[in-house]
Amino acid sequence: MLIIPAIDLKDGKCVRLKQGRMEDDTVFSDDPVATAQHWVNEGARRLHLVDLNGAFAGTPIHKPVVEAIAKAQPELPIQIGGGIRSLETIEHYLDAGVSFVIIGTKAVQDPEFVEQACKQFAGHIIVGIDAKDGMVATDGWANVTDVKATDLAKRFADAGVSSIVYTDIARDGMMQGVNVEQTVNLAQYSGLPVIASGGVTNLDDVRLLKGKPGILGAITGRAIYEGTLSLREAQLLLDQNTL
């Protein structure tokens, strides 16, 4: 299991939002490439990038920044989400050295697109499911749908999706702890590996997720930026065989 640092990009800077509200941001760095290097130095084995402007615009805004990070970290698996609505965009990111592309809103609106992407880019597609009270949210979390997160995950079980990033919106950026039950439930219901996101605040949260069936990793943002969680300590804990 991996601890995956999040680098959320807004207006060229690294920020953290509270519950996905663009106006409620905290800027942590104005140099995303240096931030990526910092987390690599701290022992990161994968990076989670989000183009926040892209998520709201419906098209990538931070391509040059993402490319620069991928170029600087050629050996490191990188996953990118935010504004990915076309096969051309996916191809562009993969050609630039990104390992995984996360399809979010488009997966809800057009499930066939995900199936098509999985065929064309086998092994590189992650579905991002953002949910509030178990219901899927889209368009940068601005719109809560009547689609159940578990149903959406199940829909892609046989499509060739490599994993699911599951974000509990109510907990994201709020430092309230991770929703272990819903995350494990999603993994078991869909049969797909799940990366937990939203609310990973300290080592206790990491312990709660460790060893749970179907959990591939946990994304953490505000906690590692504000220092309530050490990336190095968390990964060390996960690498130990004991719970």
From Swiss-Prot:
One of its GO terms (biological process) is L-histidine biosynthetic process. Keywords: Amino-acid biosynthesis, Cytoplasm, Histidine biosynthesis, Isomerase. Gene3D superfamilies: Aldolase class I (3.20.20.70). Belongs to the HisA/HisF family. Pathway: Amino-acid biosynthesis; L-histidine biosynthesis; L-histidine from 5-phospho-alpha-D-ribose 1-diphosphate: step 4/9. The keyword Isomerase applies. One of its GO terms (molecular function) is 1-(5-phosphoribosyl)-5-[(5-phosphoribosylamino)methylideneamino]imidazole-4-carboxamide isomerase activity. GO terms for cellular component: cytoplasm. Its EC number is 5.3.1.16. It is found in: Cytoplasm. Its main location: cytoplasm. It catalyses: 1-(5-phospho-beta-D-ribosyl)-5-[(5-phospho-beta-D-ribosylamino)methylideneamino]imidazole-4-carboxamide = 5-[(5-phospho-1-deoxy-D-ribulos-1-ylimino)methylamino]-1-(5-phospho-beta-D-ribosyl)imidazole-4-carboxamide. The active site is at D8 (proton acceptor), D130 (proton donor). This is 1-(5-phosphoribosyl)-5-[(5-phosphoribosylamino)methylideneamino] imidazole-4-carboxamide isomerase. Pfam families: His_biosynth. It comes from Acinetobacter baylyi (strain ATCC 33305 / BD413 / ADP1).
